[in-house]
A protein has these predicted regions:
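A polyanion-binding, active-site-adjacent surface
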Residues: 1-186
């Protein structure tokens, strides 16, 4: 029997709420993982490989995320839920536009409500600004935990930014994931 999250994913699979539906997407990338996860990651949007496979974070950024989850949290992706701010790939991997983020927000809100994670880790500016409802950037916001719903939100860098930036962003992302581990244990 399909779960409530499965039903929302099925409904989202035919979404036409914004122009991304007709911008060359292969499919909606709804999210993946444990529907009862205590930890949820929220990124920006699917890239080319994610669009092809229909799964979030399967390219180089996803490989880094998987590696850091295992090293810093001791868990694998099947024990978390991974979603994005927008569910369709923006053309040319451009940033999602405000109207696209707004059109997709109800899908993310339903995911958050149904999964009820104890800890949400936002990956990068778009997810962080949306869920914290702020204009501040990730560089100012990361390094702390924020009350969020019935748990906490921990902002960190997007893995793609870490791949580009190397040393210091990687060390900071590791520290943020340690913070997530501590919040899960609390």
């Amino acid at each position: 029997m399909p779960t409530a999250l499965d039903l929302v994913a099925e409904e989202a699979s035919t979404c036409q709420r914004c122009k991304l539906a007709d911008a060359g997407r292969t499919q909606v990338v709804f999210g993946m993982g444990d529907p009862h996860a205590d930890l949820m990651f929220v990124g920006e949007g699917p890239g080319a490989e994610e669009d092809r496979q229909g799964l979030p974070f399967v390219g180089r950024s996803g490989q880094l995320l998987d590696k850091l989850m295992l090293e810093e949290l001791g868990i694998t992706r099947d024990r978390v839920f991974i979603a994005n701010t927008v569910k369709c790939r923006p053309p040319g991997n451009r940033d999602p536009e405000p109207d696209e983020i707004a059109a997709c927000r109800p899908w993310l809100e339903q995911q958050l409500s149904l999964i009820e994670p104890k800890v949400v880790v936002t990956l990068g500016n778009f997810a962080t600004k949306l869920l914290l409802e702020t204009k501040e950037g990730i560089t100012k916001l990361r390094g702390r935990s924020y009350p969020f719903r019935s748990g906490v939100l921990i902002p960190t860098f997007h893995p793609a930014a870490v791949l580009r930036g190397g040393g210091e962003p990687l060390a900071q992302m590791r520290a943020d994931l340690v913070r997530a581990k501590q919040a899960l244990a609390a």
